[in-house]
Amino acid sequence: MNLQNELIGKKIRMVKMLDPYPIEPNTIGEIWGVDDIGQLKVRWENGRSLSVIPEIDEFEIQD
């Protein structure tokens, strides 16, 4: 199991997303999966489902 798979089920808070239609800063989401290239699949509290690219997007793992 790689480290990213251990993040499944964790809550994250978006800091900054580089996307044409980004998730707003401070939005909370739950990681529900990791795809083949390492993007984190997230269900956001605003109803959106948008992946996070760990090498590009800034986020914080919540306790």
Regions found by a protein language model. Give the residues of each.
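Basic/aromatic-rich interaction segments and small domains that mediate binding to polyanionic partners
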Residues: 7-63
